[in-house]
Structures are given as C-alpha cells and as structure tokens.
C-alpha cells in the first residue's frame, strides 16, 4: 500500500508494586505518515484512532498471536505479532497447551456421539447449522469498496439456508443479522441442539504484502477427521462453482468453530474479497446461488458416502 503502516510498537506496563519486566498489560501504538482517513482493527475489532499529526492508536492486546489491520481507502495492510504471557518472578516458560475441544465446548469426555446420518436418510431428518462468520463489532476482511466480510458472509449464508431448505433439510442459523455470537458459542449450540453437520461461511483476504491475484483461491477447512470428509465433498463442488478461482482443496486447520468432536464441521472460504474481481463475484447474487447449490451437492455426496 502507498501509505504503509510504519510501526506497531508494543508497550508493556508493569503490574502494580512490581518491577520491570513483569507485566500485566500490553498495548500497541501505531503511526503512519499520512493525513488521509485511516481505520485500524485489532483482532478484527475496530479501535479508536487519535490524530497526532499522523495518528496514534492504543488498544489492549492479548498473549499469543494478535492481528493488526490498517485500512486506508481501498488498501488494507495486515500485520501479525506475538505477545508473551506475563510470567511470575522466577517462573520457567512453558509451551502453550493444544486446544482441548471437550473442555472448550463443555462436552463430557465419555459422551456418546451420534453417527453420521445413514445413506437414504430423508433430508428433513437431517439438521444443518449454517454459520455466517464474524458479525457485530468483528467485521472480518475489507473489500476495495469498503464492504465488510461479515456482510458478504451473511448474504452467502442466507442464500445457503434457502438452498438447503429447498432441498428439504432442516436448517438453523447461528446469526441472521449483524450480531456476534461468541466463537465457542457457535459449536456449543450445534452440540446442544444435536446438529448433524455444521458449515461456517467466510471470505478471504491476503495479509501484509500479499498479492491477492496470486493468492486468490477457494478452500474448505476442517479441524478433525470427522469434518475432513465433509470438507472434501463440499470443496469439490465449490471449486467448480467459483471457477476460474484456483482450487486449494480441503485442508486441515485448527479453527474454533471446527474443532467440534461431536458434530462434523467445516469452514468454507469462498473467495478473496480484497481483490476487485473477488469482491464483484462475491457480491453477485447469481454466483452466490451457484456456491450455495454447490455446498448442498457436496453435503448430498457426503451423505451418500
């Protein structure tokens, strides 16, 4: 981008009555040499920008990986940085623990899960949860014209809801408006309401320095074996629906909404919206219908396996 994000400076403050370097709060300060309008997002949430010749922004970050997005006009720059967890004096550093989906979702370890619906099960007996990613204060990625990913997601999710209902499925949405259900509340609800499968809808964007024309692809993610076969079946059809977008296949990634051990779950990244062509395609209701029909066909293939 032309007006690059110059700095993302971490400033740590000592806990009360402690000496440096013990910390309990970490803040990020950014600056850019421009007098144009900027927007700054920290972990998907817009934060206040204070004008100080260029600008100054301050927001609390959390231990682990954080994402800082700087948006100016049609340009978006994304920087990721890590913050160490404050340690007690004399404490040895310990590696981070892997996610425990049972603990995360409050599922008993001895819980018995329903099998995948048998081939020939009437669609009306199959419960599908459709999740429109992001929402509320979490906007997700931004398109060149400033449209937010959360809005692309809800449009595609509602289109999918209609397509599933036309095929006879029972459908539940995690959100139908500009709300933000907490990430773990989405899969928890799928468990609580005994869903047979869970589909999360997202749209992608390149990170800092990335070329969206080179990076542009569609992909469907799963986080465990239970979801991977579903992801593969869906991605085969989605890839054809969004041609000539490159097919990145079905991939495994640890995602909060997909680590559900009880319900087969996957996350579909339809297209790259920070590319004008991807933005235009994702805003096209005809293309949305094609993607929705593709996901339905993928689900039907998976059920027949």
What are the functions of these language-model segments?
Residues 2-305:
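Catalytic-site microenvironment of enzymes
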């Amino acid at each position: 981008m032309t007006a690059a994000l110059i700095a993302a400076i971490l400033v740590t403050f000592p806990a009360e009555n402690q000496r440096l370097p013990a910390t309990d709060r970490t803040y990020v300060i950014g600056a850019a040499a421009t007098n144009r309008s900027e927007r700054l997002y920290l972990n998907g949430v817009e934060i206040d920008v204070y004008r100080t010749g260029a600008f100054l922004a301050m927001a609390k970050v959390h231990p682990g990986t954080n994402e800082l997005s700087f948006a100016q006009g049609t340009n978006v720059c994304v920087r990721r940085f890590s913050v160490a967890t404050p340690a007690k004096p004399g404490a040895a550093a310990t590696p981070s623990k892997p996610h425990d989906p049972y603990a995360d979702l409050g599922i008993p370890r001895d819980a018995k899960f329903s099998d995948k619906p048998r081939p020939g099960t009437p669609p009306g007996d199959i419960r599908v949860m459709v999740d429109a990613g992001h929402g509320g204060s979490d906007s997700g990625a931004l398109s060149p014209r400033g449209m937010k990913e959360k809005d692309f997601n809800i449009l595609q999710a509602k289109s999918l809801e209609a397509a599933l209902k036309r095929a006879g499925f029972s459908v539940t949405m995690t959100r139908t408006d500009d709300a933000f259900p907490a990430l773990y509340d989405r899969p928890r609800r799928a468990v609580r309401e005994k869903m047979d499968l869970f589909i999360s809808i997202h749209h992608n964007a390149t990170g800092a320095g990335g070329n969206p024309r080179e990076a542009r692809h569609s992909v469907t993610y799963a986080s465990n074996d239970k979801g991977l076969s579903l992801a593969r079946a869906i991605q085969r059809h989605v890839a054809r629906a969004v041609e000539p977008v490159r097919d990145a296949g079905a991939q495994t990634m640890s995602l909060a909404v997909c680590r559900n051990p009880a319900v087969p779950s996957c996350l579909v990244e339809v297209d790259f919206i920070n590319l004008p062509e991807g933005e235009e395609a994702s805003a096209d209701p005809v293309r949305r219908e094609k993607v929705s029909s593709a996901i339905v066909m993928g689900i039907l293939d998976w059920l027949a396996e």
